[in-house]
Amino acid sequence: MRIQIPNIEVYEVNESIQNKINTAEEDITNIKFENVVETVQGYKLEFKSCKFVGCICTASKFEHMYFTDIIFENCDFSNTDFSESYFNRVEFINCKFVGTNFMVSVFNNVKIKNSNFRYSNFSMSKIKEFILEENDLANSYFQECEMKNTYISKSDFINTQFFRTKLNKIDFSDSNIEGIVVAMEDVKGMIVSEFQALELSKLLGINIKT
């Protein structure tokens, strides 16, 4: 599946995200944040055409934020609050976002690759043009989400909750969905392997005669 990729022009390298937020009079644009280690507090700001490389900003707050044309690479934003935020043309590569809150957010043209998003919460988010490749999303939450045009490959969804999220036309066949939480109406049109279909039937209380 093809999605729009981030369009980034970086002109400045900055060593503090918080200082940039504190002094911002308008959108934060064309910045590369590299090897930043700090706890950040941000609210209702927009980052455009920026790169975050090797940053460690755990237990931070980025509520109601806008991220457009952004790359996160080799970053750790675990236990950070990104709730009610907007992500458009964003890539997460080799990142750690364990226990991160993305509730009630919007994701358009977003790619997450080779990253750890265990225990992250995407519930009540609107998700489309979304690629997940080789990620660990075990014990994460996608409850009551709208998911459209989503491509998933070789990812781990052990005990992940998709309750009240329609999984129509989403292919999980080469991913691990052991113990996922779904309702009968959620799995209509979901694409799975033969073995996964048998496991899902057990979760849903369906007995198959052999």
What annotation goes with each model-predicted range?
Residues R2-T210:
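Tandem repeat scaffolds
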